[in-house]
């Protein structure tokens, strides 16, 4: 799971009571895809029957950490993108289903 807060605090606090292993991810817009890919690879490798891929974000936090704090009162152009305040989750498992992950693409750095 992952989020946009420093140290992945929202994910860590949300998962604490579950008492299950956790990969803490921090990839901004890519966190959902990273979590889904990691969950699919873990299930395919037999590390678990079910994996939960979770991500969350918060507009105010994203502004504070990646752009300008809201208290700075920076003017935003009408075309500016806005970070959603929300969360999403996928349950990835090894049971037969019509919904399948058949492949994924992981990037690499080329200089």
Model-derived features: positions:
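Condensing-enzyme catalytic core mediating Claisen C-C bond formation in acyl metabolism
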Residues: 68-111
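Short acidic, glycine/serine/threonine-rich loops at helix termini
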Residues: 9-12, 62-67
